[in-house]
Curated annotation (Swiss-Prot):
It comes from Salmonella typhimurium (strain LT2 / SGSC1412 / ATCC 700720). One of its GO terms (cellular component) is plasma membrane. InterPro entries: Chloride_channel_YfeO, Cl-channel_core, ClC, ClC-type_chloride_channel. One of its GO terms (molecular function) is chloride transmembrane transporter activity. It comes from the Bacteria. The keyword Transmembrane applies. HAMAP family: CLC_YfeO (MF_01115). This is Putative ion-transport protein YfeO. Its main location: membrane. It is a multi-pass membrane protein. Belongs to the chloride channel (TC 2.A.49) family. Gene3D superfamilies: Clc chloride channel. The lineage of its organism: Bacteria, Pseudomonadati, Pseudomonadota, Gammaproteobacteria, Enterobacterales.
């Protein structure tokens, strides 16, 4: 009934569905536990002892303690809580399963404690390792690389609530050939991403879109404005690219992760006092609060962007277990709102979307993911042609430039 190619795709459907659902459940469990722990640390506990959660004492103390605890986990847990996200790419080969409990615990404590990183890198690492460990036993004919692709696709679908991001990302890596078309290669990853996104939607839906005025019609001047905004965002991101490896090397001369992360947490606390609670945590909920605020002005948006960018660099350089995409989206949104407040003639839809495109492009160096994040935060079909055009000079600016990553150090 089916062509042999179709039968091959159908055989991969079951493991793809299982991996997609499992990837989402791991993410949901981690986020739920972190959310409950966050409410306890930042609401119930300070209220019970009569301290305001946004007081300088509480912010500095909580983030310093978070750094010390994460440092203890990294030093003493088996596998040292997995690889350092500042060194490893988002998608990499499986790590030892023995490192996963420490990595998951370090992620949850970091998220709950207010560290300015997202969950994407540790969750990706955990899901890839679990998929390779269990999948190789259940389906031994499927290679470790295939499990890595399926787990990363399922995780991307779960993280962003849609399989579109996974389809875009893997369309550039799983290229077709004369014998195997690209969509044959995409079938199983897209199935995993769809299963991951649908499972996530049963429990919660990630809120990326901001309440920004509709963009009516593209004009030539808007293309120039968008390119300038993206260039400004890239310039800001390249400051982080320059700082991260140098700060990472400086901090890791101390050798002791408890000391490194304790110092990192203390600095994050100081930055949190300067920027306020909006600059804490992974940034998605805080981005919504920032966009809905009626009291923030251009200076406030500038402060939020600068503090969050500094916090992102400090958190990554210290070795906290977390990802950099979600904070980059917050920084881009704050930068875009600041630029619109300065030059109201440029629509906020352009400044916000193009700033996010530029920042995410610096962080990920992935054009499709950058376009996707800009489009979901400002969901306006009229913007898509403009974003595609603005991507071209932005990509030229970053061609050959160093990545937002630290260098490996000899122990």
């Amino acid at each position: 009934m089916f062509h042999p190619r179709a039968r091959t795709m159908l055989l991969l459907s079951l493991p793809a569905l299982i991996i997609g659902v499992a990837s989402s459940l791991v993410l949901i469990a981690a986020m739920k536990v972190a959310s409950v722990f966050q409410q306890f640390l930042w609401q119930r506990l300070p209220t019970s002892i009569g301290i305001a959660y946004d007081s300088p004492f509480w912010i500095v103390g909580m983030l310093t303690l978070t750094g010390i605890v994460v440092g203890l986990i990294i030093r003493y847990s088996p596998g040292h809580a997995g690889p350092d996200p500042a060194i490893e790419p988002l998608i990499s080969m499986p790590v030892s399963p023995s490192a996963l409990p420490g990595l998951l615990l370090a992620l949850i404590i970091g998220l709950a404690g207010g560290v300015s990183l997202g969950p994407e890198h540790p969750i990706m690492t955990i899901n890839i390792a679990l998929a390779a460990a269990f999948g190789s036993r259940l389906f031994p004919r499927i290679t470790a690389l295939d499990w890595t692709i399926l787990a990363s696709a399922g995780t991307i679908g779960a993280l962003f609530g849609t399989p579109v991001a996974a389809a875009l990302i893997f369309s550039q890596t799983l290229s077709g050939s004369n014998d195997i078309p690209m969509w044959d290669r995409l079938f199983a990853p897209l199935m995993a991403a769809a299963a991951g996104s649908l499972t996530t939607s049963l429990f919660f839906h990630p809120h990326f879109s901001l309440p920004i005025a509709h963009y009516t019609q593209m004009r030539l001047v808007d293309i120039a404005s968008g390119a300038i905004v993206a260039a400004i965002a890239i310039a800001a991101g390249m400051v982080a690219v320059w700082c991260l490896p140098r700060l990472h090397e400086l901090l890791h001369r101390l050798k002791n992760p408890v000391l490194i992360l304790g110092i990192g947490g203390f600095i994050l606390g100081i930055l949190g006092v300067i920027g306020g609670p909006l600059t804490l945590f992974k940034g998605l909920d805080e981005m919504q609060q920032m966009a809905f605020s009626q009291t923030l002005g251009a200076g406030d948006y500038f402060t939020l962007a600068v503090v969050k960018l500094a916090a992102l660099v400090i958190a990554a350089a210290s070795g906290f277990r977390g990802g950099r995409i979600f904070p980059a989206v917050f920084i881009g949104a704050a930068l875009g709102l600041m630029l619109h407040a300065h030059v109201e003639a440029v629509p906020a839809a352009i400044t916000v979307s193009c700033a996010i495109l530029g920042l995410v492009l610096v962080v990920t160096r992935d054009g499709w993911l950058s376009l996707f994040m800009a489009a979901v935060v400002v969901p306006d079909t009229n913007l898509l042609p403009l974003l595609c055009i603005v991507m071209l000079p932005a990509w030229l600016l970053l061609a050959g430039k160093p990545l937002l990553a630290a260098n490996r150090h000899e122990p």
